[in-house]
Design a protein with these regions (language model features):
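Conserved alpha-helix/loop element of class I SAM-dependent methyltransferases that forms part
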Residues: 5-20
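Conserved class I S-adenosyl-L-methionine
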Residues: 22-30
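Conserved acidic residues
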Residues: 22, 77, 96, 124
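S-adenosyl-L-methionine-dependent methyltransferase catalytic module, highlighting the catalytic core
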Residues: 2-7, 33, 85-89, 100, ...
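Glycine-rich phosphate-binding loop signature in dinucleotide/nucleotide-binding domains
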Residues: 19, 90-93
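Class I SAM-dependent methyltransferase SAM/SAH-binding core
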Residues: 32-78, 83
Length: 170
């Protein structure tokens, strides 16, 4: 299972707490880091409730079923096991926040751009975490070919979108 840098965690959680979304779509669930952290710091942190009767919707998309374990079902309301681009093209559901945690680079540049455009249509806010630059090449694995990085992204790739804020972590 792929994993991601930790340097951006507190920054992301602070942003999401300020946005205070009632509904989140976590694209690329993987280990479940972001869904768990969003659940903790949007619901448990302030009221200490662990009963699973959540007030917010946190859904996820994961293309590789082998990543989804029993614990995911506690933190996520629903997990869609499909390609994120297909899901966003076919779903009518809208979210306050659509989050991409190291996902966009697993698509071609054309498909990744389309994915962002769809998210901007279906989300009030879109938060993207992505490795920047050419030093993040990654092949798929024998178990999961979807781990392959199919595109390289730079900060200026995101400036074409109407509203954007870019923060780089090293």
């Amino acid at each position: 299972m792929g994993t991601s840098n930790w340097q951006n965690i507190s920054y992301n959680i602070e942003l999401v707490r300020k946005l205070d979304p009632d509904s989140i779509l976590d694209v690329g669930v993987g280990f479940g880091r972001w869904g768990i952290l969003f659940r903790e710091f949007l619901e448990i942190w302030d009221n200490g409730r662990y009963d699973g009767n959540w007030q917010r919707v946190i859904d996820g998309i994961e293309i590789f079923p082998g990543y989804i374990k029993d614990y995911h079902r506690y933190f996520y309301n629903e997990i869609f096991l499909e390609n994120a681009l297909d899901h966003l093209q076919n779903s009518e559901k809208k979210y306050d926040l659509i989050h991409f945690g190291d996902v966009i680079e697993h698509f071609t540049k054309v498909d990744g751009t389309r994915l962002i455009e769809l998210a901007l249509q279906k989300g009030k806010y879109v938060l993207i975490n992505i490795p920047i630059g050419r030093y993040w090449a990654q092949d798929g694995t024998e178990d999961n070919p979807f781990e392959e990085h199919k595109s390289v992204w730079y900060n200026n790739d995101f400036t074409k979108f109407r509203y954007h804020k870019i923060k780089t972590f090293y």
